[in-house]
Amino acid sequence: MARFHFDCVFYYVRDIEKAISFYSEVLSLRLTSRDVVARFDIDGVLFELIPTRDEGKLRGDGNARLCLKVDDIDDTVQYLKTKGTHADEIQKVENGKLTSFEDPDGNEVYLWQYD
């Protein structure tokens, strides 16, 4: 029987330099390596940015989303505003609070604060 192991989460991006800047400077993610692909480590999970010119891959309308856990969603949303990033209205859900925003390529990123 085949065995599967988690490898990574990735987003296609139009401008790799702009995307690296957004994820490293705005979201404070640590860039761990860079060749054609930019790689970040998020609590032991590999997150990659892959440059492409294929507009079909840049639609950002797939089902996969990056979801980042935060301690204080209200403070985080205020911080994002200072960086020019607008988050949607914070929603109260059964086990916490949730909001989302888009990266420079229209990929949706979620913020989650657990109760």
Question: Which stretches of residues belong to each language-model region?
Answer:
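Short beta-strand micro-motifs in enzyme catalytic cores
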Residues: 38, 64, 97-99
